[in-house]
Amino acid sequence: RTVCPNNEIITDNAGKPSVMVYTPKFTMKEMIAGGSDRVHPAFVVNGVERDGFYISKYQNTEIDGRGYSLPAEIPRNCVGFDLSRSKCTAKGRGWHLTTIQEWGAIALWCKKNGHLPYGNNDYGKDKRENMYRAIRVSNVETGKGRVLTGTGPLSWSHDHTVAGIW
């Protein structure tokens, strides 16, 4: 909890934690000038309007065949859709892959609030920020620039704070 004081720690059916960021419900007009009073589709699940949703703070790492959102871990990569989905649903009720609607809501929020998150696009750093680097997974991975989850600068977070989505 010390590393992520403004986030939620949610456990799965195996009792293992994931760090999650809560996104409260908003309407289209709150994000887009001239938008409608409709609630953004990310907040409507099976026809039921929700107050918000949780999204993984970090790219997931794999523990015991399941995905977990944890800081300073090696992110799982090269996983196909079906395997990714099974790793999420194995965690129990309510766990799912992030939907296109949820990513859309996050993108609209970022645009509205003037935040364009940076990220690892140059072997552990962002090409736009030469001074900042994340912690590389391994310096011996020739040609690979993967970094430990959440170790980049604040500009890599969706809201540019420690509480954001990395």
Predicted regions mapped to residue ranges:
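Short aromatic-cysteine micro-motif
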Residues: 38-166
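N-terminal module-boundary/linker segments of secreted carbohydrate-active enzymes
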Residues: 1-42
